[in-house]
From Swiss-Prot:
SUPFAM superfamilies: Serpins (SSF56574)
Organism, scientific name: Tamias sibiricus (Siberian chipmunk)
Protein name: Hibernation-specific plasma protein HP-55
Keyword flag Secreted: yes
Keyword Membrane applies: no
Amino acid sequence: MPSSISWGLLLLAALSCLGPGSLAQDAQETEASKQDQEHPASHRIAPHLAEFALSLYRVLARQSNTTNIFFSPVSIASALAMLSLGTKGDTHTQILEGLDFNLTEMAEADIHQGFQNLLQTLNRPNTQLQLTSGNVLFIHQNLKLLDKFLENIKSLYHSGAFPTNFTNTEEARQQINSYVEQGTQGKIVELVKELDRDTVLALVNYIFFKGKWLKPFNVKNIREEDFHVDEATTVRVPMMYRVGMFPVHYCRTLASLVLQMDYLGNATAIFLLPDKGKMQHLEDTISTEILSKLLKDRQTSKYQVYFPRVSISGTYDLKDVLSSLGITRVFSRVADLSGVTEDAPLTVSKVLHKAVLDMDEEGTEAAGGTVLGAEAMLQAPIMKFDRPFLVVIYEHNTKSPLFVGKVVNPTQQ
């Protein structure tokens, strides 16, 4: 085994269908369900996930103001928290503090129990909202993981490990890609283009989300319209249209119109459309406190909403991004991952993350929906998403931001 080993961390988020949970896990959840509902452990870590999400977003936004952004803070945070189980010393502290946890105010056990509850909640079968997540380790067939690490990642993060022949990089690449393709039901293929020769361990984390609008758009109302990427660039996009009652709020602090659109189930998409020329102001000013207040403001108004069909993805090597958040030691020669294995010193070389967002008109009409007549439709004000905007997809049971993004150009893949 080489003395210095590169560790590949692959994080995925995409649309998929929810798979059934294991019987053992279901039985465990049933026994603890009452306690979880009264005081969910995931609620204690939710504010920290939200702070981490906005910190990560700002770093990505500073890197480029001309490209779409889309990532899953829950996916990234759960993978890093799981990895922290095998770290020690400053390496350990940096990861958890980089995720916005103060170890003098919250016990580490509470952090991991929060993620355990979060993952259990997200993976509960739901006939309305299709949502699932998971973690798996691919390890060099000659590398022995410590029993304590394996036990912890299994019990807290529902993760397992697959022996992998990393000496044959092509074989290992195909094994990982095959797992990802099967797990995403073909949504993501050939994710890993190549593996470094010294890679001996890879963590694949995924979160899949597919929601149907509580109040859908009508496919018959879709038409091509302009989307203004910037002052000099305009693209044509399929623009969806619906008139109805929406939770809409103008936030003076953010200089933005805020639209909330519910999914069937327990998730809401929050769209923030800044005034012209105010995107930078929105990005600098938005906070977890403001988002919390916006989520509570559910007063509805009549609006004609125009919204582009969106199919975007974000692919990132987050090493530099995480380093800017203070997570540096795990990428260095002095990284301490001795809680993972004692066979050889490990170093994280890459943190790869891919997230995919598809938004279209699909949905199922909810009972008791409001229908407006032609006269009311003409009187309703217009809210048109025809310029860059932000999106946060929020899951209510866990109070967590599943996805965060910025749509700069809906035609940009």
